Design a protein with these regions (language model features):
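Membrane-embedded alpha-helices of multi-pass transport/permease systems
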Residues: 48, 112-124, 128-131
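Multi-pass membrane catalytic core of lipid/isoprenoid biosynthesis enzymes
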Residues: 7-53, 128-160
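Alpha-helical transmembrane segments of multi-pass membrane proteins
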Residues: 60-64, 106-114, 118
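Short, small-residue-biased leader/transition segments that mark boundaries at the very start
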Residues: 1-3, 162
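Cysteine-centered, disulfide-bonded loop motifs in secreted/extracellular proteins
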Residues: 4-6, 83
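Single, functionally critical "micro-switch" positions that shape active/binding sites
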Residues: 22, 72, 114, 121, ...
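Intramembrane alpha-helical segments
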Residues: 15-102
Length: 162
């Protein structure tokens, strides 16, 4: 629903909110509905899992603004997208152990890699409007950065036999 930037990027300006097909109040209503359904599911789990799930909302809430603050918004995306690894352990084991943390960090590295690739399609528009990303940060050296992030992901995931 942060449409200011979406309306200024070629790839995203035709999305429903920037294109005017869905209003911000309609999107907020849908968000509230989804949040209530998610909360109903979350409350079925143990207390530790509920707290872990609620904690994820901080990262989810700040992510859309990170591209204005840091060259590393893909890290914050990785923290958010990979949170499910922590949730799985929280639900099943009632806690988070070293295996969960290794899975989490390995998944974050994987997300940084694929979202860096994805961000390259918007790099020109992003530069014009001041949006930061690892794609812009790495530029021509992206392939070397991807070797590092995907290499780290493979190493970490292999340590836990995934």
């Amino acid at each position: 629903m942060c449409i200011r930037d979406s309306a200024r990027v070629e790839r995203t300006r035709s999305r429903p909110i920037p294109a005017g097909q869905v209003s911000v109040p309609q999107a907020l209503a849908f968000l509230v509905l989804q949040a209530l359904i998610g909360l109903a599911v979350l409350l079925q789990f143990n207390r530790f899992a509920v707290v872990t799930g609620i904690a994820s909302l901080i990262i989810v809430a700040v992510y859309p603004f990170m591209k204005r603050v840091t060259w590393w918004p893909q890290v914050v995306l990785g923290l958010a997208f990979s949170w499910g690894a922590l949730m799985g352990f929280a639900v099943i084991l009632g806690g988070i152990d070293l295996t969960a943390l290794v899975l989490y960090v390995g998944s974050i590295a994987w997300v940084i890699g694929y979202d860096t690739i994805y961000a390259h399609q918007d790099a020109e528009d992003d530069a014009l409007i001041g949006i930061k990303s690892t794609a812009r940060l790495f530029g021509a050296a992206t392939h070397r950065a991807l070797v590092v992030f995907y290499g780290l992901a493979v190493i970490l995931l292999s340590l836990i036999h995934i």
